[in-house]
Amino acid sequence: MDPNTVSSFQDILMRMSKMQLGSSSEDLNGMITQFESLKLYRDSLGEAVMRMGDLHSLQNRNGKWREQLGQKFEEIRWLIEEVRHRLKITENSFEQITFMQALQLLFEVEQEIRTFSFQLI
């Protein structure tokens, strides 16, 4: 796990939590929750890769491992689309920078999860 990615997650989450988007604050809270969930999932996959023998225990604990992986990719795609949409509609430069960084982070995390999952398959 790249320490820069960890600090990026923390930075993005902190920035998003400070945003006031009016009526869409519920949506923003949902995005923050999904970012946190995605970070935890990515971290757990990374730990499983570090302990390569964990593939079998991971599969035994969670018989629907591949299905869960597919759901995470769906969440990433949804978050990417949501962040792109927010980026298009916001005029606040702080929010634009935050959403651009969030988008870059999502692309990096998607690639990391793909790499981890290929190593585990």
UniProtKB/Swiss-Prot annotation:
SUPFAM superfamilies found in the cross-reference section: Nonstructural protein ns2, Nep, M1-binding domain
Matching InterPro entries: Flu_NS2
One Pfam family linked to the record: Flu_NS2
GO-annotated cellular components: host cell nucleus; virion component
Gene Ontology BP annotations: exit of virus from host cell nucleus through nuclear pore
UniProt KW GTP-binding keyword: no
Keyword annotations of the record: Host nucleus, Host-virus interaction, Transport, Virion
Positions occupied by motif Nuclear export signal: 12-21, 85-94
Localization (cell): Virion; Host nucleus
Subunit annotation: Interacts with protein M1. May interact with host nucleoporin RAB/HRB and exportin XPO1/CRM1.
Role: Mediates the nuclear export of encapsidated genomic RNAs (ribonucleoproteins, RNPs). Acts as an adapter between viral RNPs complexes and the nuclear export machinery of the cell. Possesses no intrinsic RNA-binding activity, but includes a C-terminal M1-binding domain. This domain is believed to allow recognition of RNPs bound to the protein M1.
Extra facts: Average number present in a viral particle is estimated to be 130-200 molecules.
Family to which the UniProt record says this protein belongs: Belongs to the influenza viruses NEP family.
Name of the molecule in the record: Nuclear export protein
Organism lineage string: Viruses, Riboviria, Orthornavirae, Negarnaviricota, Polyploviricotina
